[in-house]
Amino acid sequence: MKDEFGREIRSFRLSITPECNLKCFYCHREGRTEENGKLMSPDEIGKIVSASLEFGVRKIKISGGEPLVRKDLPKIIQNIKNDQIKDISLTTNGILLEKCAEDLKKAGLNRVNVSLDTLNPKKYKEITGGDVEKVKRGIEKAIFLGLTPLKVNFLAMDITLNDLSEVMDYCKKVGAILQIIEFIPVDPNLKHHHIDITPIEEEIAKKSEKVVTRKFMQNRKKYILDGLEIEFVRPMDNTEFCGHCTRIRLTYDGFLKPCLLRDDNLVDVVTPLRNEESIRSYFIKCIKNREPFCKAE
């Protein structure tokens, strides 16, 4: 199904918990500003995903909070798994990944994205409160088990820019894809950390041996530089990002969310599900609510 702007729905991002085992100062909390809802059960999540298939969803991304803090995550993945789903991936901070990777692989997870803004232990602890060595071990365990292609999410900010070269070298060494992500300063007090990543992309484009445009990923370009795959994610003021968005979202407490950058047009889908109603009409409402946050002039 297409929305009123001609955009197909292909991807469904599931936030399964607001809880996290780190305290990153920049966290946008998947666009949610409240934490007062009840978590969905694995069965409820499975039913909602199953209902989404009719509307074109073929890829699932699991996020949080930190999804690995849910001990029933393997069960959630098992309930999501379906012959029509082509890809189940997960975004994690990586702290618990070494411990959980094998069970997630067995449950049916295909691949992971891991946040890594610096390899400097002191700076990592200052930014997140965590231990970067645990993250590295998790990344390497996941790659060993075949949870690939593994992507490293590097958040480009004023305080992490000097770490980019080292993170690039690490990704090349372990065989990870690098995603350089523009920082979204949801809190106005953090705006000074935002940097324009256009010059970084232009410099990498000049040096790259190959450039591929990904049609179903907001026309995002993939650069090949010395064997390393590099992608850029620029959601701010980006008409390409919004104009080609194929994703809807589900909040941890059961609301369909048409847009990452909006919190005023959510559609409650878990209440009718719990009342044993059909939830088809709620997906239709969500898709009709979709519009590009950034529109071309």
From Swiss-Prot:
The keyword 4Fe-4S applies. PROSITE patterns: RADICAL_SAM. Pathway: Cofactor biosynthesis; molybdopterin biosynthesis. GO terms for molecular function: 4 iron, 4 sulfur cluster binding; cyclic pyranopterin monophosphate synthase activity; GTP 3',8'-cyclase activity; GTP binding; metal ion binding; S-adenosyl-L-methionine binding. Pfam families: Fer4_12 (PF13353), Mob_synth_C (PF06463), Radical_SAM (PF04055). Its EC number is 4.1.99.22. Its cofactor is [4Fe-4S] cluster. It catalyses: GTP + AH2 + S-adenosyl-L-methionine = (8S)-3',8-cyclo-7,8-dihydroguanosine 5'-triphosphate + 5'-deoxyadenosine + L-methionine + A + H(+). Gene3D superfamilies: Aldolase class I. Catalyzes the cyclization of GTP to (8S)-3',8-cyclo-7,8-dihydroguanosine 5'-triphosphate. NCBIfam families: moaA_archaeal, PRK00164.2-1. This is Probable GTP 3',8-cyclase. The lineage of its organism: Archaea, Methanobacteriati, Methanobacteriota, Methanomada group, Methanococci.
